[in-house]
Amino acid sequence: MRGRAGETTMTAALQELAAHIEMKRPDCVISTEIAHDELTVVATPNSIVGLVAFLKTDATCKFSTLIDITAVDYPERAQRFDVVYHFLSMYQNHRIRIRVPVREDDIVPSIISEHPSANWFEREVFDMFGILFSGHPDLRRILTDYGFRGYPLRKDFPTTGYTEVRYDEEKKRVVYEPVNLVQEYRQFDFMSPWEGAEYILPGDEKTDDKAEAKG
């Protein structure tokens, strides 16, 4: 574990990096934030390719490794989604997170021209959230089936799904059918003091024995 001095050094380095990025690319950056020794840059959708190219080639940054692309759904916001990019600079030993707020009907430029590995990441974001990427050479589902309905990681997607898949012995093939619950769907509230399950943990019996002895 790093001590307070190490955390201060890391925070100072990230503050310098954030200031450098804001100074060099003010047209791309909406805001920056440092929390838990991590730098997050909020950027505009139209500038994402240029910003990623800058982060990759700039001598101070050198974020040459794309770790991941994902998204977060905020149904209550006008800009419903955050497309989130994670990059690593092995040269500077830094990580950076780029957040791009987008509306449900916005189209985000693909960064495949800068990071070919973004191909499958962007396909996964499209498959799970329905976010479109312009300039992608093969934007189709990657995890769900061809005729899958909806986007599973959106907050309004039903936990039961819309269809169920099973093998039909008579037809000798896989068939799709509407979801047919054997019993009514129930929402369990395990945090409720009234409906919560009673878990007996190791050592609880000793407490009960002491209570009986006092009684």
Curated annotation (Swiss-Prot):
PROSITE patterns: COMPLEX1_30K. It is an enzyme of class 7 (translocase). Its EC number is 7.1.1.-. It catalyses: a quinone + NADH + 5 H(+)(in) = a quinol + NAD(+) + 4 H(+)(out). One of its GO terms (cellular component) is plasma membrane. The keyword Membrane applies. It is a peripheral membrane protein. One of its GO terms (molecular function) is NADH dehydrogenase (ubiquinone) activity. Keywords: Cell inner membrane, Cell membrane, Membrane, NAD, Quinone, Translocase, Transport, Ubiquinone. It is found in: Cell inner membrane. Signal peptide: none annotated. Its main location: membrane. NDH-1 shuttles electrons from NADH, via FMN and iron-sulfur (Fe-S) centers, to quinones in the respiratory chain. The immediate electron acceptor for the enzyme in this species is believed to be ubiquinone. Couples the redox reaction to proton translocation (for every two electrons transferred, four hydrogen ions are translocated across the cytoplasmic membrane), and thus conserves the redox energy in a proton gradient. PANTHER family: NADH DEHYDROGENASE [UBIQUINONE] IRON-SULFUR PROTEIN 3, MITOCHONDRIAL (PTHR10884:SF14), NADH DEHYDROGENASE UBIQUINONE IRON-SULFUR PROTEIN 3 (PTHR10884). NDH-1 is composed of 14 different subunits. Subunits NuoB, C, D, E, F, and G constitute the peripheral sector of the complex. Belongs to the complex I 30 kDa subunit family. This is NADH-quinone oxidoreductase subunit C. It comes from Dinoroseobacter shibae (strain DSM 16493 / NCIMB 14021 / DFL 12). The gene is nuoC.
